[in-house]
Amino acid sequence: MSETDAPDPRAIVLETVAKLPNLPGVYRYFDAEDNLLYVGKARDLKKRVSSYFLKNLASPRTALMVERIARLETTVTRSEAEALLLENNLIKTLQPRYNILFRDDKSYPYLKITGQEYPRMAYYRGAVDKKNQYFGPFPSGWAVKESMQILQKVFLLRTCEDSVFANRTRPCLLHQIHRCSGPCVNFISKEDYALDVENAAKFLRGRQSEVLETLQGKMLAYAEELKFEQAALVRNQINALSRVLHQQSMETGGDADIDIIAVIVQGGRACVNLAMVRGGRHLGDRAYFPTHVDNALASAEESIATEVMKAFLAQHYIEKFIPGTLILNTEMDEPELMLALMEQCGHRINVVFQPQGQRRQWLEMAHKGAEISLARLLSEQGSQQARTRMLVDALGIDVPDLESFRVECFDISHTQGEATQASCVVFHHHAMQNGEYRRYNINDITPGDDYAAMRQVLLRRYEKVANGDGVMPDVVLIDGGKGQVEMARQVFVELGLDISLIVGVAKGEGRKVGLETLVFVDGRPPQELGKESGALMLIAQIRDEAHRFAITGMRAKRAKARQTSRLEEIEGIGAKRRQKLLARFGGLRGVVDASIEDLASVEGISRQLAEDIYKQLH
């Protein structure tokens, strides 16, 4: 078949569009090189996809993308909610060029109240269950801890671990400073403690007035029974709760859980600021910075803001808690998206664009926070991009796209040969990529042999890359001088990798920052960049992060080894008995503090063995 007889890709695409069903689903556009351009969802695939191929498209960016479409794929789903879920997964996994992308963050923290006889409250992050009560989510760990402090002041709930609670014979410091009612030593009845837990839960759900009425009734009842000491304790609770309510902005309407979302677009970047109100209390906010905003399929910043808002709602809430009310600073008409979210969460969502009163103040705060966060990002981004450019120029690297420039840095850490660990940190997209950090436990080497440790970690890291699996960075940064760099060279030669990627950072005289020398293995002479060099500042930032990451891992490993090793050295203490001792006394420190009688009370520990344990630990 001649070139003139070859089928027209556009004709094939239009033919495919004409055959699409009027059903919900997800569509994907590809260019001639089979690169994924865009992923979208639709209630009606045929109607939605056909709209892209109209003659007069409102957005020039959309028209530009449509010109590049060489083929399309579709997946039919049972509902629009299912399409929303699939679209979200594909966007996050495949990262199409024209989709606005919000990077996955850690799950939000919760405040947990356990379902035990004497419940404890705790900071929690992870999947929720039905055995315990969970309140949140909260925008930050700080917000959870602040709420816990309030509950300690007002309701005196315990926060201690169960092993500590079960073995206390006298109240702890928290009871002495009036932050715990002392249920561990029966200073409060089970019924009164349960009432405090119930009131704490009501407070977190926004039923503060009801809690105040309950406490006032309880205080009057104690007074009538001439139990003035108990009445005074309840009065203190009322005063503490009143102070909290006075200090914080409280929502008095019917819906106590609200999310306030403000979007700002400027300079090709966007910021989404999410503020959370839970139980009527404003818990703070969190800023998000999506990528691919400069490729968004919109014609103006106002339209891009709408696209960013839609992308945030779809990607953020698809697997997270959605409150009953959303307050947005960007108006949009997206009934299909909201119906899909409501189907996903199982309850009605009230969307507000023009709030009044307290809610208006909250939206203004969120909007201002977005402006400040975006201004800070643009400022930092400008300086960080400049440093990246300086480093690329200083090393003489040919990088077609500065955004893709990638550095991996290695550091070895140990204490006199104990608990040796190697760390690898990653710099990419002008920022440290925490999610790509890795630690490597180093085994089967002579203690303290940093060269052998470096050889082991580099082999483990790049053996797969040499076999075609994984990504090779533009620079491999080694925290060390000629010896470490020579070991890296040997590994790269062995694996058939480019040795010019290796850059060593030799510490200067007195280990002073700014006096470092860059060491190469491909014939280039050592290079001193100078104290004021932006390139050196970036190298120092990456190297220091690798060192920090290695040190924290090494300390944790060493502490764990020491905690178990002291008990392992005692004859007659196996894994099961060791576990029982640690569980009973809440850790090695508790075992050390225990008396012989306490040790002998543990199942499987005889009097003689208890004496042996006590002697070994003292």
Curated annotation (Swiss-Prot):
Residues 22-100 form the GIY-YIG domain. Keywords: Cytoplasm, DNA damage, DNA excision, DNA repair, Excision nuclease, SOS response. GO terms for cellular component: cytoplasm; excinuclease repair complex. It is found in: Cytoplasm. It comes from the Bacteria. InterPro entries: GIY-YIG_endonuc, GIY-YIG_endonuc_sf, GIY-YIG_UvrC_Cho, Hlx-hairpin-Hlx_DNA-bd_motif, RuvA_2-like, UVR_dom, UVR_dom_sf, UvrABC_protein_C. GO terms for biological process: nucleotide-excision repair; SOS response. One of its GO terms (molecular function) is excinuclease ABC activity. Residues 209-244 form the UVR domain. Interacts with UvrB in an incision complex. HAMAP family: UvrC. The UvrABC repair system catalyzes the recognition and processing of DNA lesions. UvrC both incises the 5' and 3' sides of the lesion. The N-terminal half is responsible for the 3' incision and the C-terminal half is responsible for the 5' incision. Belongs to the UvrC family. This is UvrABC system protein C. It comes from Janthinobacterium sp. (strain Marseille) (Minibacterium massiliensis). The gene is uvrC.
